[in-house]
Design a protein with these regions (language model features):
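Long, charged low-complexity interaction segments
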Residues: 1-37, 76-77, 84-91
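Amphipathic alpha-helical scaffolding segments comprising HEAT/armadillo-like alpha-solenoid repeats
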Residues: 41-43
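Short, cationic/aromatic linear interface patches
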Residues: 45-91
Length: 91
């Protein structure tokens, strides 16, 4: 699977019926730029936030992004391994 841009990923989620409030979309881009995270890591943080919280939680999302960037995590696979190892989520 090729990496989608954040915009493409959000459109994909919307096509599956998930609706983001307008402020959430802005916050997603804020977090991406604030942490200088790649699209792949940003999308993974969105995915894991939704799985853990069952809705978009901006502070949880930014916290994940910060952890991923601080630990030099660059792929979805590595991000999922990281949250499993740190027991941040039960996935």
């Amino acid at each position: 699977m090729s990496v989608k841009t954040v915009e493409e990923y959000l459109l994909h989620l919307q096509s599956k019926g998930f609706q983001f409030p307008e402020d959430a979309v802005g916050f997603i881009y804020f977090g991406k730029h604030y942490t200088n995270a790649s699209d792949e890591i940003t999308n993974t943080a969105i995915e894991l936030t939704l799985k853990a919280q069952l809705h978009f939680d901006g502070s949880f999302y930014v916290s994940l992004l910060e952890r991923f960037v601080a630990n030099k995590i660059e792929t979805r696979y590595d991000a999922i391994q990281y949250v499993k190892e740190k027991q941040l989520l039960l996935i």
